[in-house]
A protein has these predicted regions:
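Short, low-complexity disordered leader/linker segments with a strong preference
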Residues: 1-46, 353-355
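Short, polar/charged alpha-helical segment
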Residues: 35, 47-71, 85, 145, ...
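Loop/turn elements at helix/coil->beta-strand transitions in domains of secreted/extracellular proteins
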Residues: 43-46, 66-69, 91-93, 171-175, ...
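Extracytoplasmic ligand-binding site segments that recognize negatively charged/polar headgroups
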Residues: 49-56, 78-79, 91-231
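A ligand-binding cleft/hinge motif common to bilobed small-molecule-binding domains
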Residues: 102-106, 228, 233-251, 301
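Periplasmic-binding protein-like
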Residues: 126, 205-210, 217, 249-272
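Mature extracytoplasmic/periplasmic domains
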Residues: 262, 266, 271-328
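Conserved C-terminal helix/tail region of periplasmic/extracytoplasmic solute-binding proteins
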Residues: 326-355
Length: 355
């Protein structure tokens, strides 16, 4: 039986970076034409590294209005940062679109991002942007559980409703989580719960949780995919409209943890030294200055969280109260990243999947 567990009234917020291996978006065939009035004279191709190809229509709109072609590469935030560092900070992509903001904070500290100043930046919530305009947020990713009802029934397993429940021995070997060193979403889980629980209690929690984790996947989508494939009973996963849609296709339960919903802002930035830096910088301004573009982003993202980023925008209404989110300091996502990941690597041991 498909059901939605939540004691909170909430709606879901609705290959290589350095080689030319991208694909041109084609979900809606773009019409390349002369730039529209108000757009600067831009040319060439803008290469975008993104966490998903769901944004094709947004980039096609940019192409139609500016004449700049777009190539997209799909990569998680941790992979982007690792490859950028490995190549000495010389990118072959221009725009970084999506992924946990912790990696963007680290990239800024490493001098790998371009400063992007524009008037509309003043309308963005300062909590979710860099004070010096080196990175911005396009929304928030919230995290909960996806449970395979068939497996849960076969294993006589209770549906977990809280983070504390996952420590029960009945879930041993049946929980999958993504490697937080690769998945910004799951790094957000670790950082948020450590902030909420405190260092000592938080690390004790993850040590205990590790006993029940089957393995740590290399992409943020692994928990969702493995649960619907009947491989594992419980996945720690992002929650959005794409997860909601699974209720119509699979015998699963979506769980919003009653003891707190972790989240992480999703970043947007321009790579320093990018080949088409002008197009990438203009895209950032084009996106945030026009509410129509942000509304399209919300539609494609199947989230309303862009309203949190730009509270003044019209055309999108926030589908939930931010009170449901855990109370954390966003700045710590970046400053604590290296220490947390180093400690978590030891904790994971041979359960971490890196390839």
């Amino acid at each position: 039986m498909k059901k939605l567990i939540s004691l909170l009234l909430v709606l879901v917020m609705a290959l290589s970076l350095f080689a030319g291996c991208g694909t041109t978006p084609d979900a809606t065939e773009p019409v390349t034409e002369a730039p529209t009035d108000g757009a600067p004279a831009l040319s060439g191709t803008m290469k975008v590294v993104a966490t998903s190809e769901a944004y094709v229509d947004l980039f096609n709109k940019f192409t139609a209005e500016t004449g700049v072609a777009v190539e997209m590469l799909s990569m998680s935030s941790g992979e982007v940062l690792s490859k950028l560092r490995a190549e000495g900070g010389t990118p072959s992509a221009d725009l970084w679109f999506g992924g946990g903001v912790d990696a963007f904070m680290s990239a800024k500290d490493d001098g790998l991002l371009e400063q992007v100043n524009f008037d509309a930046a003043a309308e963005l919530d300062p909590t979710y942007k860099d004070a010096d305009n080196y990175w911005f947020s396009k929304g928030l990713t919230i995290v909960g559980f996806l449970v395979n009802n068939t497996l849960a029934a076969e294993l006589e397993m209770d549906i977990p409703t809280a983070w504390a429940d996952l420590l029960d021995e009945q879930y041993a070997g049946e929980i999958i989580m993504s490697n937080p060193a690769i998945s910004g979403t799951n790094y957000g889980v670790v950082n948020c719960l450590l902030q909420v629980m405190g260092e000592e209690e938080g690390w004790a929690y993850f040590e205990a949780l590790n006993e029940n984790i089957a393995y740590y996947g290399r992409r943020g989508s692994d928990p969702k995919n493995k649960v619907i494939a009947d491989e594992y009973a419980v996945g720690i996963t992002f929650l959005d409209g794409t997860i909601d849609a699974l209720l119509e296709q699979y015998d699963v339960t979506i769980v919003y943890p009653t003891d707190g919903i972790p989240y992480i802002p999703e970043g947007v930035a321009v790579f320093k030294g990018a080949e088409n830096v002008d197009a990438a910088k203009y895209f950032v301004e084009w996106l945030y200055a026009n509410d129509e573009n942000l509304a399209l982003l919300a539609q494609l993202d199947q989230k309303s969280a862009v309203k949190v980023i730009k509270p003044s925008m019209e055309g999108v209404e926030l589908a939930y109260s931010t009170d449901i989110l855990v109370d954390v300091d966003v700045a710590l996502f970046g400053s604590q990243r290296e220490d947390i990941l180093a400690k978590f690597e030891v904790l994971m041991g041979d359960k971490a999947v890196t390839e």
